[in-house]
Amino acid sequence: MLGGRTNHWGRISLRFGPKDFKSKDYDGLGENWPISYDDIKPYYNKLDKLIGVFGTKENIFNEPDGFFLPPPKPRLHELFYIKGARKSGVTVIPSRLSILTKRINNTRGVCFYCGQCDRSCSAYADFSSSSCYVIPSLKGGMVDLYTNSMVVEVKTDNNGKAT
């Protein structure tokens, strides 16, 4: 299937926070990563801009903010959840999903809330590798696509470039 798992991942676009990279320092369990959140933050920022992620800046320590498009307005049932959660003292924030609520380029459309995200988006408002990388690459004429195939080896030259 063109796009593979990026067709089925639900578009959930959360960042690991500082604690996730250094969990041993916080709870004594597992091992710390050899990198920190600050090391990877520039790549998260680049990815947010590339794929388009909606959300809101919340300043929650281990749920880092990113570059967000505006989230959709809450639906009626979500307003009930929010009201109940706030009454109970539970923090509620909008999802952080890679679905375009605002145009970021000329190849992908904007979500019109049809509710068919699980079946692939006809407006290309959701991120998938096929709609955002493969199809545009094919239009450039420098890529060959082999379906029903599996890569077992990528050969590289002395500079590490695929040959």
Residue ranges and their predicted role:
Residues 1-11:
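Conserved phosphate/anionic-ligand binding catalytic regions in large, soluble enzymes, centered on
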Residues 150-163:
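Conserved beta-strand-loop-beta-strand element in the redox core of flavoprotein oxidoreductases
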Residues 16, 100-103, 152-155:
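Flexible loop/turn segments at secondary-structure boundaries
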Residues 2, 21, 111:
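Short clusters of hydrophobic/aromatic residues that line enzyme substrate/ligand-binding pockets
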Residues 12, 24-148:
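Conserved redox-cofactor binding core of oxidoreductases
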Residues 17-25:
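Cytochrome P450 core scaffold surrounding the K-helix E-X-X-R motif
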Residues 2, 141, 158:
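Short, ordered coil/turn segments that flank beta-strands lining enzyme active or ligand-binding pockets
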